[in-house]
Amino acid sequence: STNLKNMKKTISCIRHCSIEVLENGQSISCGTLNITATPAYNINRKRSNGQPFHIKGEGNGYILSIGSFKLFFAGDTEFIPELSVAKGADIAFLPKNLPYTMSDEEFIEAANFIKPKNLFPIHYFEIDPAAIRKSLLPGISLYVEGMQV
């Protein structure tokens, strides 16, 4: 479990940290908070000119960790191999938004691959929480609009 005293120290420390731009794979620490930039990009989703909506190497997701607690924010991405760095996250925010990120099926596949304890869909226009819930592995709690499904 996360020590709340350490979290207070981390939050206090954030006020005094400098801002740095991270590229894919780079990390920075501020007190007990560690931030790692992860790739976020498209493989299949492309503009009419053939260019991906999100180009590999340009966009980031982020892993924030304090001790053993890990939060993953995927950013604008599809289900890509690099999502493996988020396996077992305590909290994961995954995008579900065609045509720019993941379909329902890809969202479910990515969630079951990562196996976060708590899953929050983001960037969605429409969502069927009951259908998604039925397809998730046991042990993954799904939250939509702040409510557990």
Protein language model features and the residues they cover:
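Short, well-ordered alpha-helical microsegments
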Residues: 7-8, 80-83, 103-104, 128-130
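Active-site-proximal segments of metal-dependent phosphoesterases and phosphodiesterases across multiple
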Residues: 85, 91-112
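Active-site metal-binding motif and surrounding structural segment of the metallo-beta-lactamase
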Residues: 1-12, 20, 88-93
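Catalytic metal-binding/acid-base residues of hydrolase active sites
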Residues: 5, 41, 78, 97-99, ...
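Binuclear metal-ion centers of metallo-dependent hydrolases, dominated by the metallo-beta-lactamase
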Residues: 11-14, 18-27, 106-108, 112-149
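Core dinuclear metal-dependent hydrolase active-site scaffold
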Residues: 21-87, 102, 145-149
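Active-site neighborhood of phospho(di)ester-bond hydrolases with catalytic His/Asp-centered motifs
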Residues: 1-3, 72-75, 92-97, 118-123, ...
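Short, surface-exposed connector motifs at secondary-structure boundaries
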Residues: 65-69, 89-91, 112-118
